[in-house]
């Protein structure tokens, strides 16, 4: 009975956070963003690291605003490894984000520690440290005022250290809530002749999701992601996915004031998942762009011995692979 009451409480918290995200009006996103964020949580929340049943490797590529020269292109490769004591985890993120004449590459190592907060729920705290390599080649751009001193064929190369943190509260394959700050260090990019070029600010990320069992073969998986940056509009993402027979995923997403999306995924094997999404812009960019494409590939490696105290039954899966998460 107590477990059932707590389950209803978490559902209420989940929908309340969605409402809070929609009603916020003073922030926005500056980190690379993803339509399939629910399968890519480790890229922006180190608290997620180590919460999976088996080690996993994920790769994602996003081509944004097709037909627009210099539009963003993002490539991410990440690893997520739960340690043998099942209370700690390690992760590695490598993200390359291209926009116009600039390329920014993030390399970060994450660590998390988790503990039980109830019989079924766990709380994980994580931190990541690393750096961002920024390259800006102004000779590749077309500018309104080409006579500016900084545009005389100059190339900027900078390294910026990064320190981030986050928490992830979850119950395996049922629900999750998380919050994170990708980088506490907010040094801007400056030039002596033109003052500030890029003014960096803290970003806050809030995420949540729930898995509803509709029947034995169908699951409903709503989720949200809110990105907040001081002084800019909110970036709110809502998604609804349906999982059929633990193998096929179909869904839709909406980014407020920005885009609507279609999502599809397929569990190729018990250890391989591939997902795809297409965004159609609902803002004025839709007149100039044919949309955005995103593809993700995940590999669940297993621990080699088929044992995991969090998953007593392997449910017909190969011995080395535990059941993949429904998140």
Regions found by a protein language model. Name each.
Residues 1-31, 240, 326-327:
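Bacterial Sec-dependent N-terminal signal peptides
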Residues 29-327:
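Subset of outer-membrane beta-barrel
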